[in-house]
Design a protein with these regions (language model features):
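Hydrophobic/aromatic beta-strand patches that form the interior of the parallel beta-sheet core
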Residues: 18, 42, 154-157
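PAPS-dependent sulfotransferase catalytic domain
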Residues: 120-186
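Aromatic-acidic/polar surface patches that form glycan- and anion
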Residues: 13, 24, 109-112, 134-138
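Active-site micro-motifs of SAM-dependent methyltransferase domains
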Residues: 37, 43, 49, 164
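Extreme N-terminal, non-catalytic leader segments
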Residues: 1-17
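A conserved segment at the C-terminal end of the G1
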Residues: 29-41
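PAPS-dependent sulfation machinery
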Residues: 44-132
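Glycine-rich phosphate-binding P-loop
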Residues: 20-32
Length: 186
């Protein structure tokens, strides 16, 4: 058997994706960081936001920007998918009730699946990881990921009491949008 020519040749052809589902503020970031500290695992965060942000990281430190630039360079041009439409039509639970958008959904599904497969492969190759952790939470996104033959998918469902999830939205020590208990109907 000939030796592998590069480190990339040693990785499996299919990236292994650990997809974390559950309510926001259920512990997915803590789980992702813990897994990301293990050899061969890269915590990518909530990848459902990658296309709407055109692959631009929200934090602009040099190492992070350089990493995501290398990821984008490994991918094709997902121009049709940039923006919020794929997320609204394919990933969000409310998409199930948007029967008026079935044509748009059908038109977006194939490029969405191709870009998503490319994204996981590009992240795994750039990070030198066998596993990519995506903590996007959405069950419909998990459903779309299950249809991708190019990845090996593992699902994790985090469960936290509804009262604790709602209480966490009222905290002011988190750099995300806050909701009051009245807004969340608690």
């Amino acid at each position: 058997m000939a030796p592998a020519s590069s480190e990339e040749d040693l990785r499996p052809s299919k990236p292994k994706v650990i997809y974390v589902m559950g309510a926001g503020r259920s512990g997915s970031t803590i789980l992702g960081v813990a897994l990301g500290n293990c050899d061969g695992i890269f915590f990518a965060g909530e990848l459902d936001k990658w296309l709407p942000r055109a692959g631009e990281p929200t934090r602009k430190d040099a190492a992070r920007v350089a990493f995501w630039e290398r990821v984008r360079a490994r991918m094709g041009d997902p121009e049709i998918l940039v923006g919020a439409r794929p997320r609204r039509y394919l990933e969000r639970s409310s998409a199930l009730f948007r029967v008026d958008r079935l044509r748009a959904l059908a038109r977006l599904r194939a490029p969405y699946r191709e870009a998503t497969s490319e994204l996981f492969a590009a992240i795994a190759a750039t990070a030198g990881a066998d596993y990519v952790v995506d903590s996007s939470h959405y069950p419909l996104r998990a459903h779309e990921l299950q249809s991708l033959a190019e990845i090996e998918l593992y699902l994790v469902l985090l469960v936290r009491s509804p009262q604790s999830v709602i209480a966490s939205f009222a905290k002011d020590d988190v750099a995300e949008r806050r909701f009051s208990p009245v807004t969340t109907r608690a």
